[in-house]
Amino acid sequence: MAKTRPGVASKIKTGRKELDSYTIKGTNKVVRAGDCVLMRPSDAGKPPYVARVEKIEADARNNVKVHCRWYYRPEESLGGRRQFHGAKELFLSDHFDVQSAHTIEGKCIVHTFKNYTRLENVGAEDYYCRFEYKAATGAFTPDRVAVYCKCEMPYNPDDLMVQCEGCKDWYHPACVGMTIEEAKKLDHFVCAECSSDDDVKKSQNGFTSSPADDVKVRLSLFSHLLYRCSITYL
């Protein structure tokens, strides 16, 4: 199975009837409109495609087709994968398609970014999405994203960060001269800028669950971040 190019819709024949659901071949898993699914790629060496099912149809011969909206992985986007992209990150695109239901391999869950960061255990079927992506132009929505640390990068939930009890900003251990092992042993952390501040109040636990839960954040244009990271990657 291969994705069609954005803007090139598959031919849809008349005489189709809409179905409420489809059972994935060889399983008891039922797919309905609104579900997210894993679809078999044309290249067996690549990970499965991820799509959101918009509609399910069958023709007179009971050939079932699914109308889907593709999720793109960062490496499939015009900007490419960057250091702040998580391994399970996806972009909801404006690329719609029609594919055979037989290409569906399984179901998955695409969480909101905040809900994903609250998962106690991330399973193989768990993904997250924080951006929508226009496949033709490479534009992202929203065009601004929260940034943290001295490096002013968005939060990657795969990376450990520590929170300063003074300014409440989050930091990568490497950016403040610590190893990950040292950071894991911390009960409290105060950044260099706050360490001389006598008004910093020590709490029993200075860590909230994750940067995604913070209300006060700095914002940066996402396009600028992609450009900065592309220079870093050279």
From Swiss-Prot:
Keywords: Chromatin regulator, Flowering, Metal-binding, Nucleus, Transcription, Transcription regulation, Zinc, Zinc-finger. Gene3D superfamilies: 2.30.30.490, Zinc/RING finger domain, C3HC4 (zinc finger). SUPFAM superfamilies: FYVE/PHD zinc finger (SSF57903). GO terms for cellular component: nucleus. A zinc finger (PHD-type) spans 146-197. GO terms for molecular function: chromatin binding; histone H3K4me3 reader activity; molecular function inhibitor activity; transcription cis-regulatory region binding; zinc ion binding. CDD domains: BAH_BAHCC1. Its main location: nucleus. It is found in: Nucleus. One of its GO terms (biological process) is post-embryonic development. The keyword Zinc applies. Expressed ubiquitously, with higher levels in floral buds. Disruption phenotype: Higher H3K9K14 acetylation in the genomic region of the FT locus leading to an enhanced accumulation. In ebs-2, acceleration of flowering associated with a shorter adult vegetative phase. Other developmental defects include smaller leaves and siliques, reduction in seed dormancy, plant size, and fertility, and partial suppression of LEAFY disruption (e.g. lfy-6) effects. PROSITE patterns: BAH, ZF_PHD_1, ZF_PHD_2. InterPro entries: BAH_dom, BAH_sf, Zinc_finger_PHD-type_CS, Znf_FYVE_PHD, Znf_PHD, Znf_PHD-finger, Znf_RING/FYVE/PHD. Disulfide bonds: none annotated. Residues 29-144 form the BAH domain. Changing P41L: In ebs-1; early flowering, especially under short-day photoperiods, reduction in seed dormancy, plant size, and fertility, and partial suppression of LEAFY disruption (e.g. lfy-6) effects. Chromatin remodeling factor that binds to methylated histone (e.g. H3K4me2/3) to prevent their acetylation (e.g. H3K9K14Ac), likely by recruiting histone deacetylase (HDAC) complexes, and thus regulating the transcription of target genes. Negative regulator in developmental processes in a gibberellic acid- (GA-) dependent manner, such as germination, flowering induction, and flower organ specification, probably by modulating developmental gene expression. Involved in the chromatin-mediated repression of floral initiation and controls genes regulating flowering. Belongs to the SHL1/EBS protein family. Recognizes di- and trimethylated histone H3 at lysine 4 (H3K4me2 and H3K4me3). Interacts with HDA6. This is Chromatin remodeling protein EBS. The lineage of its organism: Eukaryota, Viridiplantae, Streptophyta, Embryophyta, Tracheophyta. The gene is EBS.
